[in-house]
Amino acid sequence: MIAGHHMDTIRSVTRIRLRSVEEPLDRPAAAWEAVRFLSTAEALGLLPASPESIETLDVRTVRAVLKEAAAAGVARQALAEADSRDERDADAWVDVLVHANVALADCPIPDRTWPGLADLLGIDLLAKLVGVAPASARRYLAGDRATPDAVAARLHWIALIAGDLAGSYNEFGIRRWFSRARSQLDGKAPADVLAGEWSPDDQGPRAVRTLATRLLDAAAT
């Protein structure tokens, strides 16, 4: 369960290794939105630079990530809301985090997202998933070439999926998840559905995201 002052480790990917939760984020709805926010922010490359793992779900941590997101031009309104509300109010934090999660889901930031996803998935798999040659992916990663809008949208969608999967899998498991056939995808692997010049609005990619989101829902209960 997410709720409560103590929790089993629910994430093992990179820096987020949550073991406890503090008020007011110990309310189930607040904890759920906060975990989702941190998961997505990490996948998008929005965690503040630090060598330390994040082991406690608390207001200080969430506020720091909100500031990092706002500095990247994302979720500025959510940060303003956080600054204007009583930070001891769990319901207020639910509102702030719902708005922050919507903002993260709607705002591709490829320059921040390429490095973390390349480390997580490997450049070859990531290039395949976003529909570009590995050489092109390396140029986008290095900043030698601007990421085209269509590629940025696909990269963002992969990051959202990876954030959802991080509630259930480690790095190896996430990479393997993309390659395993799924009955919910008519026997195809997610990597087969996410092939070529797809769009996040297409039915197949949306089905892949739904499949990943169900795993995040399960990890939160």
Predicted regions and their residues:
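Non-transmembrane "mature" sequence context
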Residues: M1-T221
